[in-house]
Amino acid sequence: GFYRPHTPYVAPKKYFSLYPPEQVPLPTIPQNYFETIPKLASTLKPEESAMDEMTKRRAIQAYYAAITFMDAQLGRVLDALERLQLRDQTIIVMTSDHGYHMHEHGLWQKRTLFEESARVPLLVAAPGMKGAGKSTQAIVEMIDIYPTLVDLCGFEVPENLDGISLAPILDNPDHPGKSHAITQVTRGGGKARIVMGYSVR
C-alpha cells in the first residue's frame, strides 16, 4: 500500500507546480454555518480556524500534489506489471481508508459523516471482467473488498461475512448491488464520553 496522501504532505516540487495556489479553488462557507450543524459534526481545531486564505490554498495545493505524486507511483506499479507480463494475472484494488475534508463545510482532515470524509474512491481491475474501465452507481462498502477478492480468486466466499462479492458489479456495472451502506465514526475518548455516530446511505 501507499502512505500518501497523508500529512505531512510531502511530494517533489514538480507536483506542487501543477497547482498554483492562487488558482486552487477554495470552498465557500455560508455565514454562521457552524450554527446550523450539530456540534458533534464539527472536527475543526483552533489552529485550523485561524488559517488565512493563502494558507488554506497552500494546504489544498499540497494535498493535490501528494495525490498526484501517489498516482505517479501507482503508474510505476502498473508499468512493472505490464513489463513483467503479469497484468492479466493480477487483481488491482485502489481505495482509501477514509475520505478527507479540504475546507468543505469549513472542516479539514477526516472523521465526519459528511460525504467528503465518509465516501472513498474504489477502483478494482480484475482479469476477465466485462465491465473493465466502466464506473457504477451501485452502493458498495469496504467490507465488500475481502469477499470480492476471495470470489475473484476462485474460492468459496464464507457465509458468515457481512460484505458481499462485487464480482457481479465488475462484470455488469448496471448490477443493482446492495440497498444501503453504513458509516460510523467515534467522538470523545480520554475523560470525555465516547459517542458513536452513524449514517446510512
Language model segments and positions:
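C-terminal cap/loop subdomain of S1 sulfatases and analogous C-terminal strand-loop tails that border
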Residues: H98-E104, I143-Y146, D151-R201
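Active-site-proximal cap/lid insertion segments
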Residues: G1-I139, L152-N160
